[in-house]
């Protein structure tokens, strides 16, 4: 499941950590990198 809602991020990959209840997987890698910096 690409869209994770709630605290189920524990079972997801580090790249799929929940952000505000919405998985950051929905964002492009560029946006993802932007969040890290």
From Swiss-Prot:
InterPro entries named in the record: Glyco_hydro18_cat
Keyword set, alphabetical order: Developmental protein, Glycoprotein, Secreted
GH18 domain boundaries: 1-37
UniProt main location, coarse: secreted
Chain residue ranges for the region called Disordered: 1-20
One BP annotation, GO: carbohydrate metabolic process
Domain of life: Eukaryota
Localization annotation: Secreted
Protein modification: Glycosylated.
Family: Belongs to the glycosyl hydrolase 18 family. IDGF subfamily.
Record protein name field: Chitinase-like protein
Organism phylogeny: Eukaryota, Metazoa, Ecdysozoa, Arthropoda, Hexapoda
